[in-house]
């Protein structure tokens, strides 16, 4: 009898474990990022990016395939031998709804999908666009070059904004996952790239469990809607900073304080550094 109970409990535990493993990241509130860099203060003003040698723009025309739901997406598209030559071209940055894929949705009083938190693929009313299009997926592919002088640098892939969730691959290898539509996402891709041409694949989901929070009175678009950049940084660089001012009682003057966090990814653990400021 005890053996039967043991086998039953083991079967139940295995079933629950399998169900937990089948929950996608974009419907799992415990997962908001995988292998993603920590958030930090703005390191470069937008007006100075065009003249910054450490920032390489990856904006342009990317290969693109739109799927009405996750089940019909090309799941192997990230592989190096997957042929995307017959795919459409899409502008990045840009939402895919304004480029002929799917439909823009405006709502100010209800969710544009079935309310079943944290799920976003349940069956909504038949008049909903999401009734026949359960969480559309956009598959993006592009290439970029890594020069010889970049190989001794630290390389970061920087997305300024992607709605609503995305997976990233470099040269067929999974780099990570991110959601949080209104904030940047960065990945350290130093160990994923080769000298010469590299293949970047991004899989974007229109909805995620984060969409329950991103429910303002607004038009609902999706895609890689803000710039994508390759950040080429030295092995020792500023990771983050904090700036504060202490005002005098009469507000006639103020003391300026700066805290700077450095990241050292070089082989040298000691040395002399200088910090310059321009006010």
Predicted regions and their residues:
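Beta-strand-rich binding/interaction modules
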Residues: 170, 253-279
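Short glycine/proline-rich turn/loop motifs
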Residues: 118-129
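Short, charged, solvent-exposed linker or helix-capping segments at domain edges/interfaces
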Residues: 74-76, 213, 238-242, 273
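Accessory carbohydrate-binding/adhesion or oligomerization-edge regions at the termini
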Residues: 20-119, 199-207, 230
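Short, surface-exposed loop/turn motifs at beta-strand boundaries within globular domains
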Residues: 55-57, 80, 135-139, 150, ...
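Bacterial Sec-dependent N-terminal signal peptides
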Residues: 1-22
């Amino acid at each position: 009898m005890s053996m039967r109970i043991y086998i039953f409990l083991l079967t139940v535990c295995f079933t629950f474990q399998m169900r937990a493993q089948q929950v996608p990241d974009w419907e799992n509130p415990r997962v908001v990022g995988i292998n993603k860099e920590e958030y930090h203060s703005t390191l470069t003003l937008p007006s100075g990016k065009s003249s910054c040698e450490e920032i390489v723009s990856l904006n342009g025309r990317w290969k693109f395939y739109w799927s009405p739901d996750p089940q019909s997406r090309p799941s192997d598209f990230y592989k190096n031998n997957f042929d995307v030559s017959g795919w459409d071209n899409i502008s990045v940055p840009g939402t895919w709804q304004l480029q002929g894929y799917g439909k823009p949705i405006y709502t100010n009083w209800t969710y544009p999908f079935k309310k079943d938190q944290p799920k976003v693929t349940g069956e909504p009313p038949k008049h909903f666009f999401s009734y026949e299009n359960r969480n559309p997926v956009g598959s993006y592919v592009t290439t970029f070059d890594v020069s010889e002088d970049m190989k001794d640098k630290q390389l970061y892939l920087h997305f300024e904004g992607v709605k609503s969730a995305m997976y990233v691959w470099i040269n067929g290898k999974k780099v990570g996952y991110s959601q949080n539509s209104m904030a940047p996402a960065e990945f350290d891709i130093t160990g994923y790239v080769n000298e010469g041409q590299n293949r970047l694949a991004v899989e974007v989901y229109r909805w995620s469990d984060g969409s329950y929070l991103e429910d303002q009175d607004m038009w609902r678009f999706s895609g890689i809607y803000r710039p994508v950049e390759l950040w080429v940084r030295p092995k020792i660089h500023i990771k983050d900073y904090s700036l504060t001012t202490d005002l005098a009682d009469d507000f006639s003057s103020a003391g300026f304080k700066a805290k700077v966090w450095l990241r050292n990814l070089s082989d040298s653990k000691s040395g002399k550094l200088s910090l310059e400021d321009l006010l």
